[in-house]
A protein has these predicted regions:
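Short amphipathic alpha-helical segment within the helicase RecA-like ATPase core
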Residues: 1-163
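Alpha-helical metal-binding/catalytic segments enriched in His/Glu/Asp
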Residues: 103, 157, 173-183
């Protein structure tokens, strides 16, 4: 199933690149809603541009696709664009605090956030603290937790992820080739 969705993303992106400016509708037959939505999401993701640091931003008359899943696709696209922006932002601009603040701002008021840093981090999470020994004072490591304010169901769901920012200065625990492949 994952592989099929992956191909649908790419088909949507290829269709977007193939179509010149204008408005398009795709007529489906025998398809399921999820397949259509993934194709439309692929179409939308093809329009992503990282222009955060550009003084002059390119105007692009991107082709548009009309479909019945606009709200859901727009929400998913917004998440993909946010993550891509984080990935493309250089480490000298986006450190641990900046990742935390960006995530908190993106999630708005629907989550409670807790941040552990400094001596408390060293006490509770000594290995995270140890890895960051070579970091500058402005880019010290931290541990954060984001919890949904309002429980939506009785089932508990736990998602564990990590946001890692790095530069190749400080303590070098990897080989040169290993450092080059980090991003």
């Amino acid at each position: 199933k994952f592989q099929k969705n992956y191909y649908l993303f790419h088909i949507g992106a290829k269709l977007n690149k193939f179509c010149k400016q204008g408005a398009y509708v795709i007529d489906y037959f025998g398809s399921k809603e999820l397949n259509e939505r993934n194709l439309h999401l692929g179409w939308e993701l093809a329009n992503y541009r990282f222009e955060k640091f550009k003084i002059v931003k390119k105007k692009r008359n991107a082709p548009s696709l009309f479909h019945n899943h606009q709200n859901q696709v727009d929400n998913e696209k917004r998440v993909f664009y946010f993550v891509r922006d984080l990935i493309n932002t250089p480490a000298n601009v986006l450190g641990p605090n900046e990742i935390f603040n960006a995530a908190r701002d993106f999630l708005k008021n629907s989550y409670n956030s807790k941040k552990i840093s400094g001596s408390l981090l060293k006490k509770k999470f000594p290995l995270i603290s140890a890895v960051g020994q070579g970091a500058s004072k402005k880019k010290q490591p931290l541990f954060c937790e984001l919890k949904l304010k309002k429980a939506r169901s009785k089932k508990k769901v736990c998602i564990i992820g990590k946001g890692v920012s790095f530069d190749t200065g400080g303590l070098n625990l990897k080989t040169g080739s290993g450092m080059a492949l980090m991003k």
